[in-house]
Each structure stands twice: as C-alpha cells, then as structure tokens.
C-alpha cells in the first residue's frame, strides 16, 4: 500500500499538477497548512486523494486557494471518508452555492469534524438552507465560522430553525453578513431554546430596533450564552433599552459588545441600570467604547464598583470637570491679573526679560516666560498672548511695548514711571 506522499505524487501525475514539497512534508504531521498556495481545483483534488487514507493530519488549512465549487466538492468528498481531520479552514475560496451544497451533505454524514471555517465564500440565502440542513443532522461540530458572506433574511430564518434543534454547536460566527428584520428575529427565536451555544458573533449586520427587541427576549430565556457581539448593528436608544430589559433577568452572559451602534449615553445608562437591578448578573465585560458619556453615567458606573471583575469600556467624557475647557480670558486681561497678583508694573514685567538692556525681547524668551508663569493657565495660546500685546499698548507719557511679525518685541521706557492702572485701563 502506498504511503500518503507516494499517493500524492501519483495523484498529481493523473491530475496534471506539479507536486509540492510542502504538501509531501506536511502529510506526516498533525497540521497541514497550505493557505495562499494557489492550489485551485486540480491541486486540491490531488491533495484530497492523498488524504483519503491519511491518519496523521487533524488540522487542514486551505484558506485562500481559489478552490471554487469544484474544489469544494473534492474536499467534501474527502471529509465524508476521512474521520481523522477535526478542523478544516476553507475560508476565502469562492466556494459559492456548489460548494455549500456539497459541504451541507458532508456535514450530515461526518461525525468527526469539530471546527469548520467557511468565511468569505459568497454564500447566499439558498446556501444557508443546505448548510443548516447538514448542521441539524450533525452531532459533533462545535464551532462554525460563516462570517463575511451574503446571508440575508431567509438565511436568518434557516439558521434560526437550526439553532432551535442543534444540540452540539457552541461557537457560531455570522458577523459581516446582511441579517436584518425577519431574519434577525428568526435567528433570535432559535436562540431562545438553544441549550449549547456559548458564543454568538453578529457584528456588522443590520439588527436595528426590531432585531434588538428579539435579542432581548432571547436573553431572557437563554441560559447558556456567555459571549454576544452586536457591534455595528444600527441599534439606537430604544434598542439599547430593550436589550437592557433582557439583561435585567439574564444570569449567564459574561461579555456584551455593543460599540459602533447608534445609541448615545441614555442607551448606555439604561444598560448600566439593568446591571444594577440584576444582582445575579454574571456580566464581566460591557463594550460601549464608542459612546460619549457624561458625569451621570460615571456616577451610575460607580454604583457598580462592587461587582467583582466588571469592566465597562466607554468613550470620552464630555462634561467631566477634568475635561471642561477653562473659561476664556482675553489675553491682555490675563497678563493684568498676573501683574496685579505679583504687584508688578507692565514695564517691570518686560524689563525682567530684557537681559541685555537692548529694549528688544526675543519672542522665544517672551514665549518661555508666558509658559512658565501663571499667565499660561489663563490664556488659550502663547501666540494669542503675544499678538495681543503687539497692539502697541501705550504706557503713560509715551512708553510703549510693541510686537511685530519678527523675532523681537520692542520696548520703549516712558519718561516717568508708568501708571499701570491708566495703562491697563486706557
């Protein structure tokens, strides 16, 4: 009997492809990684033939090999015979409807696979029917990735019916599809009575308010789900509020991701309020990281600090005292305040910076003085302070300090000590 390597070489000969050394070496290990190799339908046919009797490989990664429906059928035939492969990745292979049909039949018969990745294969609603049928007959598969496909309302109905009857699936990824309206509602209806699913990925769909209402009802009844991702689902304030109603009675969910939706701080506060009401909640992570919050939200969050392990990710705080902008003070008035507090006259203020007695102060020196003094805390920018001073504010009896669009401020001493009151309030 030929070994897997010899079988592969023979299969390459009859299919007209060049044997790949990476395949030959990988056939003796438990993991065979052939992603991005451009195998195509013929290349994967030769591989499938060599794997029919292989007992070593348990993980087969064929992502991004342009297998098309034909190649998908070859892999489906292989997996109907080989019961040693536990994990297969067929993502981004243009399998389309022909591949989905073959894989659906395979899932009905295979009792070894535990994880299947089928992301990005242009599957549509009719393909959901074939895949769901296979899943309803499967008693082993624990993890399925169908993200980045094109399932819509009918697809949601098929998968909802599957979830209501499937008793083994634990992780289901339907993110980046088009599940909305009746499809979203049907999927949630199936989730209500499901007793095995723990992780559900639904990010980047279109659940909106209708889907949020259905999900809230599912959260009230489901007792196994621990991870729910609903990011980017057009959920507004009302949707967040009804999900909060579901959280009031849910006792199993640990992670809820709701960022990149449409609700604001009111929706976020409703979620926190529900956690406050539900003393039996197991939630450990709440993601509302794109929601701008306020002090009221933070005060409500403080009341949940006794919840061990709870982490709430939120956006920036708008009206926190630490983030509020200081009230605007006209730059020249800010300098007046500084002079009055330190009992200085304007001339003395500038004279302290005129180290060489030239009566010309480098702008860089003026800038440093502003930044190092209390004036910095009063004025919005050093530049504004500089050019406010540049208005040639005349001191008493002809003294002046003027700034130009150059590198210096010119200072002229008045004939007699200036009256700061008259200068500051001309």
Across the structure, where does each feature detected by a protein language model lie?
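Leucine-rich tandem repeat or coiled-coil scaffolds
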Residues: 1-426
């Amino acid at each position: 009997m030929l070994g897997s390597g010899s079988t592969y070489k023979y299969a390459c000969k009859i299919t007209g492809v060049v044997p790949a050394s990476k395949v030959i070496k990988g056939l003796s290990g438990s993991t065979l990684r052939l992603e991005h190799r451009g195998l195509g339908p013929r290349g994967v046919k030769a591989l499938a033939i060599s794997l029919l009797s292989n007992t070593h490989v348990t993980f087969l990664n064929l992502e991004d090999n342009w297998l098309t429906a034909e190649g998908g059928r070859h892999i489906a035939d292989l997996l109907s015979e080989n019961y040693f492969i536990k994990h297969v990745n067929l993502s981004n292979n243009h399998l389309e409807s022909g591949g989905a049909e073959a894989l659906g039949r395979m899932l009905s018969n295979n009792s070894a696979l535990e994880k299947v990745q089928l992301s990005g294969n242009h599957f549509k609603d009719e393909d959901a029917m074939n895949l769901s049928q296979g899943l309803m007959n499967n008693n082993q598969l624990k993890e399925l990735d169908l993200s980045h496909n094109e399932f819509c309302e009918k697809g949601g109905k098929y998968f909802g019916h599957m979830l209501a009857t499937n008793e083994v699936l634990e992780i289901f990824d339907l993110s980046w599809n088009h599940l909305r309206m009746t499809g979203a509602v049907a999927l949630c209806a199936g989730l209500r009575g499901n007793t095995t699913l723990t992780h559900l990925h639904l990010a980047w769909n279109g659940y909106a308010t209708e889907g949020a209402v259905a999900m809230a009802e599912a959260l009230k009844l489901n007792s196994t789900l621990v991870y729910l991702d609903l990011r980017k689902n057009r959920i507004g304030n009302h949707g967040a509020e009804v999900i909060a109603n579901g959280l009031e009675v849910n006792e199993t969910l640990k992670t809820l991701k709701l960022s990149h939706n449409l609700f604001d701080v009111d929706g976020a506060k409703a979620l926190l309020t529900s956690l406050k009401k539900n003393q039996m909640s197991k939630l450990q992570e709440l993601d509302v990281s794109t929601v701008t919050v306020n002090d009221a939200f933070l005060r409500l969050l403080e009341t949940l600090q006794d919840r061990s392990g709870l982490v709430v990710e939120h956006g920036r705080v708008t009206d926190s005292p630490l983030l509020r902008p200081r009230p605007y003070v006209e730059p020249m008035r800010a300098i007046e305040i500084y002079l009055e507090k330190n009992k200085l006259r304007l001339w003395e203020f500038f004279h302290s910076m005129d180290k060489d007695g030239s009566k010309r102060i480098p702008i860089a020196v003026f800038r440093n003085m502003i930044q190092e003094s209390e004036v910095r805390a009063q004025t919005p920018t050093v530049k504004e302070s500089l050019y406010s001073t540049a208005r040639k504010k005349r001191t008493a009896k002809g003294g002046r300090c003027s700034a130009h669009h150059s590198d210096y401020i010119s200072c002229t001493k008045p004939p007699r000590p200036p009256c700061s009151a008259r200068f500051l309030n001309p």
